């Protein structure tokens, strides 16, 4: 069936003083389509609409069918049409519109809308349109079609061919930045923990007949917990199992020795005690407070309810990775995930002073023209590497995933319910999912002490999707440690849309553009308290998110952390508390042989195939 493929890029041409909220309305064959609402200029929508063509095949019907695109302002009391344009269907067939700036017919204001409008029949046509939008008139249709036929729909290779480059280079109007530079870089070796568990591309674990698994052994210093100021150099005697372990230095000149030992044989492996492998440049006072070199602790007291030292760096960086996947054109299609990334980005920039720069905030959405910024499995893992690269004490990181989540069987026998939680990239049907062990490996394990990460995962089965050690029970107001926790050295918290065995829903009240239940609630609560940040504690935020979500669905918002802390701690992007875990790495208390209940086992498999959100 034919469809009109409409891509809305950016609204421009308005004056700086016209800083009102805007959205796009599209009218086609007695149906109305609406974009998300953007709150300030410039208005970069980057949204795609697929409009079915349902008419008789004659010229009269072609001319009588009008595609209308309107720009509206959003106000408290009413909405107003600002400008519009329209196209007859036969005009769309005759003259393709590829990423062109259209001067709209003004009603209130003069403005320009950058759009693409094409007729498509299949996914190959969409691929052609996306590539045509990138190259414009620099490549003719035949060159693009030939490249598509040559590489069988592999967009990355097609663009390489058309640009005659050895590596993916600069696209139209898109410049190289740190994220793009990471794309073809292998993960750096982790100097704090060994990889746990071993990750293979297809999530297949070998030699499982004897319940074998991988171990992670602690290589962080004892001196973090005993007031010693030890220097660990290349001349220090290694234990037997560390004979061949290299020493790495990070950006703060801290020496770390990598333990390369990891056994797949449970019967022959031993649990080693941590060795004195101290940070050579960290000093401790008599109260065991840490003062990293070149960083200043400017506070004379800790965050409310906390007895721990706070980190602050005068040159700290704030970075955010925002992933929203609507799975366009599939049976799993969602409506509000890309909206979630826009809302969260606006909140981070306006309230929490993140720089609105591609070197500080990266968005991966599936309607992005540049294939580097689409949420494929490869791009997501590369983006996680970008987010955590060169992190240092005082850095603040934020991670958002909005999309589908599922569960995969845990062949390592570590998960309490027997399943790994996972997120679904846009190409999960061909490239596979990303399980929680991988998210932990790429997102959590690379983080140094004194680094803060706040993660928000709005998807099904997301409760423990990044494998943090502690879960906060809102009803009892108590922390509970995971059965087999992985303790880390950084300061990490996670808000999840639901428990591991639940589904998470979208909210579409008609008052605002659709979005995930968790993100919609979180953004609304934080924006309502824009001028009173001192009252937003973790307890306050979690309680209000929970109440807001329960108004629309029966899912249970989950909160987890890398360490226990007083929930009266302020929710902000400034204070970083010292991690007090006295053990690091994977702690195996009990291997899970099987699920306790066949009914639970059956429920997990049923939930695995649910894709409500």
From Swiss-Prot:
GO cellular component, one term: cytoplasm
Gene3D superfamilies per record: 3.40.50.12660, C2 domain
Keywords for this protein: Apoptosis, Hydrolase, Protease, Thiol protease, Zymogen
Activity regulation: Activated by Ca(2+).
UniProt keyword Hydrolase, yes or no: yes
Top-level taxon of origin: Eukaryota
Top EC group: hydrolase
Active site residues according to the UniProt entry: 404, 460
Alphabetical list of InterPro entries matching this protein: C2_dom, C2_domain_sf, Caspase-like_dom_sf, Metacaspase, Pept_C14_caspase
A GO term for molecular function: calcium-dependent cysteine-type endopeptidase activity
One GO term of the biological process aspect: apoptotic process
EC identifiers of the protein: 3.4.22.-
Pfam families with a match to the protein in the record: C2, Peptidase_C14
Subunit composition and interactions: Monomer.
Function: Cysteine protease that cleaves specifically after arginine or lysine residues. May play a role in apoptosis.
Family in the record: Belongs to the peptidase C14B family.
This protein's name: Metacaspase-1
Biological source species: Plasmodium falciparum (isolate 3D7)
Organism phylogeny: Eukaryota, Sar, Alveolata, Apicomplexa, Aconoidasida
């Amino acid at each position: 069936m034919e469809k009109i493929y409409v891509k809305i890029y950016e609204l421009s041409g308005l004056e700086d003083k016209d800083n009102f909220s805007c959205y796009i309305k599209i009218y086609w064959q007695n149906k109305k389509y609406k974009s998300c609402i953007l709150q300030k200029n410039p208005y970069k929508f980057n949204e795609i609409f697929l409009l079915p063509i349902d008419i008789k095949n004659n010229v009269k019907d072609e001319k009588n069918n009008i595609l209308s695109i309107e720009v509206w302002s959003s106000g408290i009391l009413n909405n107003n049409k600002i400008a519009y344009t329209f196209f007859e269907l036969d005009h769309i067939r005759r003259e393709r519109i590829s990423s062109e700036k259209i001067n709209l017919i003004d009603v209130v204001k003069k403005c320009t809308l950058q759009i693409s409008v094409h007729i498509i029949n299949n996914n190959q046509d969409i691929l052609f349109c996306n590539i045509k939008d990138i190259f414009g008139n620099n490549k003719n249709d035949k060159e693009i079609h030939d490249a598509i036929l040559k590489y069988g729909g592999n967009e990355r290779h097609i663009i390489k061919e058309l640009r005659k480059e050895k590596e993916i280079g600069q696209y139209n109007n898109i410049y190289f930045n740190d994220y793009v530079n990471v794309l073809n870089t292998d993960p750096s070796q982790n100097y704090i923990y060994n990889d746990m568990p071993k990750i293979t591309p297809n999530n297949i674990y070998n030699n499982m007949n004897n319940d074998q698994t991988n171990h992670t052994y602690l290589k962080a210093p004892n001196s973090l917990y005993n007031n010693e100021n030890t220097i660990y150099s290349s001349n220090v005697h290694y234990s037997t199992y560390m004979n061949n372990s290299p020493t790495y230095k990070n950006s703060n000149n801290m020496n770390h020795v990598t333990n390369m030992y990891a056994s797949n044989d449970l019967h022959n492996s031993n649990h080693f005690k941590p060795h004195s492998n101290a940070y050579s440049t960290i000093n401790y006072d008599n109260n065991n407070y840490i003062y990293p070199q070149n960083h200043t602790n400017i506070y004379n007291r800790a965050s409310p309810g906390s007895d721990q030292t706070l980190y602050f760096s005068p040159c700290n960086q704030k970075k955010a990775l925002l992933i929203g996947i609507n799975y366009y054109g599939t049976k799993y299609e969602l409506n509000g995930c890309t909206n979630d990334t826009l809302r969260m980005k606006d909140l981070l920039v306006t309230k929490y002073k993140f720089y609105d720069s591609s070197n500080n905030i990266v968005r991966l959405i599936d309607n992005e023209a540049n294939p580097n910024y689409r949420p494929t499995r490869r791009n997501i893992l590369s983006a996680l590497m970008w987010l955590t690269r060169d992190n240092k004490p005082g850095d603040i990181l934020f991670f958002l995933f909005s999309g589908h989540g599922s569960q995969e069987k845990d062949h390592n026998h570590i998960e309490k319910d027997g399943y790994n939680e996972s997120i679904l990239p846009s190409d999960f049907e061909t490239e596979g999912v990303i399980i929680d062990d991988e998210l932990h490996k790429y997102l959590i394990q690379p983080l140094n002490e004194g680094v803060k990460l706040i993660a928000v995962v709005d998807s099904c089965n997301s409760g423990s999707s990044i494998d943090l050690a502690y879960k906060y029970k809102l009803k009892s107001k108590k922390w509970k440690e995971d059965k087999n926790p992985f303790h880390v050295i950084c300061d990490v918290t996670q808000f999840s849309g639901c428990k591991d065995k639940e589904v998470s829903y979208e909210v579409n009240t008609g008052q605002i553009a659709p979005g995930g239940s968790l993100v919609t609630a979180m953004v609304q609560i934080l924006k309502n308290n824009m001028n009173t940040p001192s009252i937003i504690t973790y307890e306050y935020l979690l309680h209000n998110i929970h109440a807001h979500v329960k108004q629309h669905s029966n899912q249970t918002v989950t909160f987890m952390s890398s360490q226990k802390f007083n929930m009266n701690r302020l929710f902000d992007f400034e204070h970083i508390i010292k991690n007090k875990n006295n053990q690091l790495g994977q702690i195996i208390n009990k291997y899970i042989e099987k699920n306790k209940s066949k009914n639970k086992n059956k429920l997990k498999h049923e939930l695995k195939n649910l894709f409500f959100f």
